[in-house]
Amino acid sequence: MPKTTKNPADYILPLYMNGLAGRMLRIAPPKNNQREVLFIYGHHASLERYFGVADLMSRYGGLSVPDLPGFGGMDPFYKIGEKPTLDNFADYLASFIKLRYKNKRFVVAGYSLGVVIITRMLQKYPELTKKVDMVISIGGFSHRSDFSFSRQRYWIYRLGLAFFSYRLPAALYKHIVLRPMYIRYIYRHMFNAQQKFKGKSGGELKRTIEMEVDLWRSNDPRTYMATGHMMITLDLPSLGHVGLPIYHAGVVGDHYFHNIKVEQHLRQIYADFHYGKIKSLTHAPSIVATAEDAAMFLPKEFIRVMKKLG
């Protein structure tokens, strides 16, 4: 089957929320299908990076993907005098849902950090669970001990992220380190980048590197660092229960997370847990451009459940 050649720009609309300007991806539902699907992307992301996942999910309902403050080129919380805390992201998502869906029901899916934000939103706004038909986690997590880093690497990340989340260090990082030349020729050899670029060569490697350049230049570095620190100190199980089942797709051999610990912690939060496998070389590829590229991230058993929804 040939890959689709849809252009993300054809589906992107302006988004203005709580004094912040960003974008939203909207794909109309298939014919005779009134189901709605909300997708929340992960850390270090944009609408373009995960367009393939959005395109795939749009086969099962009308698809909406809002930018997150500080990511994808959207204004950061700092612009309105707020910080990118998990509760602020949860409040933002709840506001979007109330405005977008009103009396409609919907499926909500998240990728990595997106699952964290969805979970906190459902904990904080339990009344919204009545509108949710299904919660899907793709490479999601809920607790700091889910990370598989060595103790030394964990503390390097934790202290480094905390330091660069301050205004001056973040500004220096943006204007000195995040230059396109650095990203193209030095960043590609670092630990995290090597995981993303594994198995890529030639034109595919070049496209992946250019996507990384776009991501680092469009995302707010201070927000990136602050949310990274939030993730690496996370403890969602202590913040409440969610009275819904979660359908979690875990990456086999994920270089970031212990899948068993991820399951244990999600079971503590959600009413039930259903597991599906993702066979991927990395936790999150730099580009998921088409529905065909994204097919491995949505297990067939999850698709069957979605198709049975009213």
Identify the residue ranges that each predicted region occupies.
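Alpha/beta-hydrolase fold catalytic core
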Residues: 1-37, 58-61, 101-102, 289, ...
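Conserved HGGG/HGGXW glycine-rich cap/lid loop of the alpha/beta-hydrolase fold
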Residues: 23-76
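Active-site loop/oxyanion-hole signature of alpha/beta-hydrolase fold enzymes
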Residues: 68-111, 128
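Gly/Ala-rich beta-loop-alpha elbow adjacent to hydrolase catalytic centers
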Residues: 110-118
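Flexible "cap/lid" loop of the alpha/beta hydrolase fold
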Residues: 130-172
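Conserved serine/cysteine hydrolase catalytic core
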Residues: 214-263
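Catalytic active-site module of serine/aspartate enzymes centered on a nucleophile-bearing elbow/loop
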Residues: 269-310
